[in-house]
Each structure stands twice: as structure tokens, then as C-alpha cells.
Amino acid sequence: MYRKLLAGLLGMFTLVVVNAQEKASYFKKADTFFNTYVSEGRVDYDAIVEHKNELLELLDLAKSIELETFNASDYQAFWINSYNLLVIKSVVENHPLKSPLDKAGFFDKTKHEVGGINITLNDIENKLLRANFPNEPRFHFVLVCAGLGCPPIIDKAYLPETLEMQLEQQTLKALNDPNFIRVNKNKVKISQIFEWYKGDFTKDGSLVDFINKYKSEKLPENSKVSYYAYDWTLNGTK
């Protein structure tokens, strides 16, 4: 009985160690990948097509990594990176594309094996991230859908130990970008992201309140807000 219990405990310990090693390797390799193929908010899809195995090996590593929501920073960082990597993989698999919308089911039908499950991009965003962390609107500034209308992708992986800083940094960057928040006196044009996910941004006030929380030059309280059309043009290198 004692030997069986000991064997079981050793087995569990081994699984924990292996999972931790795989997780560390995943974040390190993801960081190298983004640093290699992302520059100034653009993705070099042509180069990735030529070296596709790097991406496939990275995502193969992600297949068996399973994380729980109670470890929020690990969980969020893993799924943010995985979303962005799977978007890139989907573009590469359908190369050349002018827009992710050129491929039917890009976000809501195509399933990917990652984190021990088969899941669509929409489900990563809506079920694994937004539903599990309903008070975290900053996801919208780090999940990159391959369209130029998204806040730009960064040349680093999101890491558990730096995630809070990175979320804050990317939100500040987006909301202080005059091309993202377009101000003309008291008329303000904002991304359709704020229209589609309005509830995420207005739990503690109006859209203007949320934007002003991060914007250095505050919007007038009486701002007339409208939405400009989302740009689905592919975010590839020029």
C-alpha cells in the first residue's frame, strides 16, 4: 500500500516537473519567435512560410501544456500568446491572404489543438479569457487578429512575470495613439472594438471614462463618440 502511494506521489511530482519545464520552454521559444518575425507591429508572414517548422514545433509544444485559472498570470500569458501564434499559423496555412476574413471560418470554425483541447480562436478569446476574467478589458489590446485594425502585435511574448506591466503598457500605447483614438475637438472616433465589446469597457462608467483612465490628454466629458470602420487588411510586413 505504502509503495503504491509513494509511486503515485512520485508520478504526480514528475508530471508537475515536466509540465513546468514544458511551460518554461514554451514561453522562451515564443519570445524568440516573436522577436524574429515581428517588427514595428507587422508580421513577416513570407519568412514564416519559409521557416514554418519553427512555428509548428512551438505550437506542438503548446498542445500538452494545461493550466488552471487560479494561476491567472500563467494562464492568461499562455492563452494570449497561443491566440496570437494560432492567428499567425492560420494566415500561414492559407498564404497568401489579404485579410483573415478571406478565409471562411478563420475565427469561429477552424479548430486548433492547444492546451490539451481542440478550440477555435473565438473560443480562446471569449470562453477562456473574457469569460474567466470578466473584469479584464485589457485583453482587447493584446489579442491580435491579423488585421491592421487591431492594436499592433509586439515583438515579445507575454510572460507571467511581466504580464501586468505588458497589459498596462499596451493599453496605454493604444489609447494614446491618435490613429486609434481620433479626436477632433469634442468629436471622437474610436475603434469598433469598443462597439463590439462595449460591456467590457463600461462596467465602471462610460467609454469616455475608460479611455480617460489611460489617455494623457483627457477627452471632454461631453465628447460625441462614433466608431470608424475596422480595418481587416492583413498586418503583414510592407
Model-inferred region functions:
Residues 1-22:
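Bacterial Sec-dependent N-terminal signal peptides
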Residues 22-238:
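Interaction/scaffold regions that mediate signaling and macromolecular assembly across diverse proteins
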